[in-house]
């Protein structure tokens, strides 16, 4: 299977997000890379599902809380930028303060 660098990045994000999802389901607090992957994958899927940019941006602030992540992680993530594929093309989505 031949994948472009972008496709490889998406696959890596998905794999890390799946691991984060499983750890969260077991009651573990997510670390920085897990939180980033979890939110990023969810944003990419929401865009793929046909949500608008505004809906995806809002959705990004509802995925994790401070109780879901290790201490200090929310302060390490002031914003997340994701290049997501929407039905009308690829757009850059920025979520400010994704972990309120």
UniProtKB/Swiss-Prot annotation:
Pfam families noted in UniProt: Urease_gamma
E.C. no: 3.5.1.5
GO annotations of cellular component type: cytoplasm
GO molecular function: nickel cation binding; urease activity
Keyword Metal-binding in record: no
Highest rank taxon of the organism: Bacteria
Reaction equation(s) it catalyzes: urea + 2 H2O + H(+) = hydrogencarbonate + 2 NH4(+)
BP term (GO), one: urea catabolic process
Keyword Hydrolase included in the entry's annotation: yes
Keywords recorded for this protein, A-Z: Cytoplasm, Hydrolase
Pathway: Nitrogen metabolism; urea degradation; CO(2) and NH(3) from urea (urease route): step 1/1
Broadest EC class assigned to this enzyme: hydrolase
Places the protein is found: Cytoplasm
Quaternary context: Heterotrimer of UreA (gamma), UreB (beta) and UreC (alpha) subunits. Three heterotrimers associate to form the active enzyme.
Family of this protein: Belongs to the urease gamma subunit family.
PANTHER family linked to this entry: UREASE
Protein name: Urease subunit gamma
Lineage, opening ranks: Bacteria, Pseudomonadati, Pseudomonadota, Betaproteobacteria, Burkholderiales
């Amino acid at each position: 299977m031949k994948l472009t660098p972008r496709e490889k990045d998406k696959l890596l994000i998905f794999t890390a997000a799946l691991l984060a999802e499983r750890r969260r389901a077991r009651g573990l607090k997510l670390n920085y890379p897990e939180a980033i992957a979890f939110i990023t994958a969810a944003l990419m899927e929401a865009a793929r599902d046909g949500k608008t940019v505004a809906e995806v941006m809002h959705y990004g602030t509802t995925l994790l809380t401070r109780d879901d992540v290790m201490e200090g992680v929310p302060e390490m993530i002031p914003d997340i930028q994701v290049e997501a594929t929407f039905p009308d093309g690829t757009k850059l989505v920025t979520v400010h303060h994704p972990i309120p």
